[in-house]
Amino acid sequence: MDNLSPEEVQLRAHQVTDESLESTRRILGLAIESQDAGIKTITMLDEQGEQLNRIEEGMDQINKDMREAEKTLTELNKCCGLCICPCNRTKNFESGKNYKATWGDGGDNSPSNVVSKQPSRITNGQPQQTTGAASGGYIKRITNDAREDEMEENLTQVGSILGNLKNMALDMGNEIDAQNQQIQKITEKADTNKNRIDIANTRAKKLIDS
C-alpha cells in the first residue's frame, strides 16, 4: 500500500467497500432464510400440538364412553337377574392404580397445560427485537458514504435476527419437550383404554353366554 498513489489507494478503498457491502448482503440473506425456516418450524410444531390435543381429547372421550358402557353392563346384569358372587364382582376399573396414575385428577395431564410456544418476538416474519450494536456502530467507516450506511443497516438487521433465532430455538425446545410429555401421556391413556375395553368385552361375553 505504501507504493500506491493516492488515487490507487482510494480505488482500493472503494473496492474493499464494495466487497464488504456484498458480504453483508449475503450474510443478511442467509440470516433471513434461517429466520424463515425457524418460523415455518414453529408453525408446524404448533399444528402438531393441536393434533396431539385432539388425540388426547379423543382418549378422554373413550374413557368417558367406557364409563357409561360399564354402567350399562352392570344394569344389564341386574335386569337379567344374574346373581353375582361377591368374589366374582368386577372391580371398579377407575379405582385401579394404573387408571389413577394415568388420569389422576386431570390436573397437570390435561391438554390445556401443554402450552404451544409462539415466536413472541417475531411479527409477520420480520425481526422485532433489536440488539445493541457495538459502540460507534458495527463497522469502521472509511468512505463514509451510502454503501457504509447500508452495511451498518444490514449488520444491525443480522444482529436482530440472531436474537430472534435464539429465542425461537428456546421456544422450539420448550415446545418439543412439552409435546414429548404429551405423547407419553397419550400412550398411557391408549394402553389404559385398551385394557378397559378388553375387560368390558369379557364382561359382555359372559353376559351373553349366561
From Swiss-Prot:
GO molecular function: syntaxin binding
Lipid addition sites, S-palmitoyl cysteine: 79-80, 83, 85, 87
Record-level GO cellular component terms: adherens junction; azurophil granule; cilium; cytoplasmic vesicle; mitochondrion; neuron projection; nucleoplasm; plasma membrane
Modified residues (Phosphoserine): 5, 20, 23, 34, 110, 160
Coiled coil (UniProt feature): 23-76
Location in the cell: Cell membrane; Synapse, Synaptosome
InterPro entries per UniProt: SNAP-25_dom, T_SNARE_dom
Keywords: Acetylation, Cell membrane, Coiled coil, Lipoprotein, Membrane, Palmitate, Phosphoprotein, Protein transport, Repeat, Synapse, Synaptosome, Transport
Ribosomal protein recorded as keyword: no
Biological-process GO terms, alphabetical: exocytosis; histamine secretion by mast cell; protein transport
Region (Disordered): 104-135
Assigned protein family: Belongs to the SNAP-25 family.
Protein name according to UniProt: Synaptosomal-associated protein 23
Native source species: Mus musculus
